Amino acid sequence: MANVDSDSRHLISEVEHEVNPGPMNIQFDSSDLRSKRPFYIEPTNIVNVNDVIQKVSDHAAAMNKRIHYYSRLTTPADKALIAPDHVVPAPEECYVYSPLGSAYKLKSYTEGYRKNTSLVTIFMIWNTMMGTSILSIPWGIKQAGFTTGMCVIVLMGLLTLYCCYRVVKSRSMIVTSDTTTWEYPDVCKHYFGSFGQWSSLLFSLVSLIGAMIVYWVLMSNFLFNTGKFIFNFIHHINDTDTVLSTNNSSPVICPSAGSGHPDNSSMIFYNSDTEVRLFERWWDKSKTVPFYLIGLLLPLLNFKSPSFFSKFNILGTVSVLYLIFIVTLKAIRLGFHLEFHWFAPTEFFVPEIRAQFPQLTGVLTLAFFIHNCIITLLKNNKNQENNVRDLCIAYMLVTLTYLYIGVLVFASFPSPPLPKDCIEQNFLDNFPSSDTLSFIARICLLFQMMTVYPLLGYLARVQLLGHIFGDIYPSIFHVLILNLIIVGAGVTMACFYPNIGGIIRYSGAACGLAFVFIYPSLIYILSQHQEERLTWPKLVFHIIIIILGLANLIAQFFM
């Protein structure tokens, strides 16, 4: 009788502080599909919430108790006794078993597990790669030369695509373990041990923190220009009178005046206007505005969950599409201004081949960087056999987008009267603060970056604190210290080195050295060697890729 009484108890214990209660108090989290497997019941025993509850069969109840018993033999983190994939029904046939003897089909489960079509997968990859690097592509083409720049963009796209292909195929080359749920750091750990795990973590943090620094510099820039636009509009000030610029309906300015360094001053001096002097004192691009952002963004970084900010991801796509629109419109208005000189520079034009082309390769390494999360993106592809095809199409679209933006901005830059060397590391800086189209672009990008910045901070927290303490939120003190370090780095760079092109190329070459060039090539060499299929051409080709990655990083320090 004791056994009968124990069998009649509820199989799912009560949980307090329930966040998302399901029907009949069922606890369900669709984000962890493997550790919380639903129990399958024949369709004859399935009911809706509003239907009369029908008891399940004795066989189904006994099977549920058996699985419940097995789950108690190990800790929840141990996957040893979880039912394997081949015995689990399809997602649309999975149901959650209630202790009251009924089964419910939860929409959140099937929706959370739904696969993406190839079109959605391609768009996701394109959208993920479209970041701040797009603002520096025209500057990179100027540094490399027009012809060389276009060739470098295409070649870097092909090289990073191949390395990304090797990342996608890396799991399938491991036959001794079940790699279904593995991410790329797990593959690195398999081949290189703890060194591979921690080194991949280090380089991933480099890319994240580098991106956050670039975001802080750009947000300071956009916030400064936004405030300057409003002030100039109210006081009827024309800011193109004090810098080298074109005199037409679509003005273009040269804030660095050929010095190669961005203008860090706020605005012009008006000796007779105390109000303007006061505004300039408290609204300076490098001395005050970066500190104003601390009050806006530091509290957002301390949120436990970034789910609210993830709702604004669509703004990234809108911003890129608007940049394409504004570049197209400006090119139509300005026309093309090109002259071809292969090696010798002229007063207004740069040569087609320049020794500074590694600066563009550094920028492009980050611009094409998706290698640390490509496995995750492709996991949800409905047709896994199309992964390689979809990846190639996405890379082609990204390459065409970079070429379109870079070529149009460079070719339409009005030379003369302005030299091509005036193209800024952020090409929006070549448009005056009073330009309405640029003002809208800066507003959109500023808001979009303010929503993405907490997400990047959350990812950095997950990777660093999660690995060190085993908890992504050990305490408010730990989180605050980490966020202060990240914010401090951003403020420091915005004040003393506000060159987004330089920051992008250094961080891109550093993180790309591991994730793009070394790890994919070494893993392929080791796997082929273990299978005794390694040939000299394969070995030499992948060693050349590693050498190119090292040369790319070293060259950044000599440019």
Swiss-Prot record:
It is a multi-pass membrane protein. Glycosylated. Keywords: Amino-acid transport, Disulfide bond, Endosome, Glycoprotein, Lysosome, Membrane, Metal-binding, Sodium, Transmembrane, Transmembrane helix, Transport. Residues 128-133 are annotated as: Important for arginine binding and amino acid transport. Glycans are attached at N238, N247, N264. A motif (CARC motif) lies at residues 442-452. One of its GO terms (biological process) is amino acid transmembrane transport. The chain crosses the membrane at residues 119-139, 146-166, 198-224, 282-298, 308-332, 355-375, 393-413, 436-456, 478-498, 506-526, 539-559. GO terms for cellular component: FNIP-folliculin RagC/D GAP; late endosome; late endosome membrane; lysosomal membrane; lysosome; Ragulator complex. The cytosolic N-terminus part of the protein mediates interaction with the Ragulator complex. The cytosolic N-terminus part of the protein destabilizes the LFC and thereby triggers GAP activity of FLCN:FNIP2 toward RRAGC. The cytosolic N-terminus part of the protein mediates interaction with the Rag GTPase heterodimer in a RRAGA GDP-loaded state dependent and upon arginine binding, leading to the GDP release and SLC38A9 dissociation from the activated Rag GTPase heterodimer. The CARC and CRAC motifs mediate binding to cholesterol. Lysosomal amino acid transporter involved in the activation of mTORC1 in response to amino acid levels. Probably acts as an amino acid sensor of the Rag GTPases and Ragulator complexes, 2 complexes involved in amino acid sensing and activation of mTORC1, a signaling complex promoting cell growth in response to growth factors, energy levels, and amino acids. Following activation by amino acids, the Ragulator and Rag GTPases function as a scaffold recruiting mTORC1 to lysosomes where it is in turn activated. This is Neutral amino acid transporter 9. It comes from Rattus norvegicus (Rat).
